[in-house]
Amino acid sequence: MWKIMRSWKCGGMRWAHRQRPSHELLSQLSFDQHYKIRSNIELLIQDYASKPIAPLNYEYFLQYRPPLTKKEEYMLTIKTINLLLSLTCKRLNAIQRLPYNAVINPHIERTNSLYLKSLQTLLSIAYPYELHNPPKIQAKFTELLDDHEDAIVVLAKGLQEIQSCYPKFQISQFLNFHLKERITMKLLVTHYLSLMAQNKGDTNKRMIGILHRDLPIAQLIKHVSDYVNDICFVKFNTQRTPVLIHPPSQDITFTCIPPILEYIMTEVFKNAFEAQIALGKEHMPIEINLLKPDDDELYLRIRDHGGGITPEVEALMFNYSYSTHTQQSADSESTDLPGEQINNVSGMGFGLPMCKTYLELFGGKIDVQSLLGWGTDVYIKLKGPSKTALLSKK
């Protein structure tokens, strides 16, 4: 089912990858030839965009485990490329269906061009020979990651600029799908690269791609709290905020994707620490309660004493179009908290909505309960793979 065209014929002229610069080739085309090429590209995008994609789950990440055979490497490569092609084309299709005044926005146009470049990178893979050349595939996937590093920031600026003429509900809906598929693409690529590295024996034996078999939760929480404390000290010149973990004597481990939990805890801590600092209560501990009722479920409660959240803010906290922060100046970027450039872009709050997207991707959830004048409790439910799936050998 996997098809990649190395070259194609149009109007008697044959085009091959890396033959000549594209601008030279395009300048020699007649209008009809140019139209046919554009039409073929549109048909390709529509074809891949129409392919159904099963939701990403832990079973996908557990399909292949190091050490991989040559056949497993080959099959993993094909599956990853197929999924990336479909996701890239779905994003291109979604952007092109935006209203005209949105598509011509320079930031949104730049995002569209970025996804076209990603499509070109994926289509440039020579079938079938480069599928058996992991270093080349890894180089192309690394290029994809690098290209999309600031993609959300760029897109958010564009959407912010068209807010006055495009309904906020539709912007939020567009971002929901975009972020979910963007996160899926990143997870697919990083999982592939991690598996290839582990296949050489280069990494932690407790890892299966990006999945950690037994992540020490208290250790990760301490790492994140130390980091956010350091940044708060630089930014606000305040004392360190203590973090208490209950139960203190039990080191709970859980199977999950560490960067996802790290991002979520960073965002929650950022809000909790800043709220307490604003009230002069940085000396009061942030309380963390852990509960693991089953092998594939973990619950966390993060309690702060930052005075709570007003009902007006609480009703909007999961909206992309809402942020409690004003736009920051460029000279403050060196003291931004982790991910803050994404979490607050041109007045658009991305932190909690992205946490929600990450959690719901794998069957988890996040709830916030606030008592105005006192503090806020954040409840996080994490879902992991079942013990049967984790122990099964495929």
Swiss-Prot record:
CDD domains: HATPase_PDK-like (cd16929). GO terms for molecular function: ATP binding; protein kinase activity; pyruvate dehydrogenase (acetyl-transferring) kinase activity. One of its GO terms (biological process) is regulation of glucose metabolic process. Its main location: mitochondrion. The modification Phosphohistidine is found at residue 148. Inhibits the mitochondrial pyruvate dehydrogenase complex by phosphorylation of the E1 alpha subunit (PDA1), thus contributing to the regulation of glucose metabolism. Also involved in telomere maintenance. This is [Pyruvate dehydrogenase (acetyl-transferring)] kinase 1, mitochondrial. It comes from Saccharomyces cerevisiae (strain ATCC 204508 / S288c). The gene is PKP1.
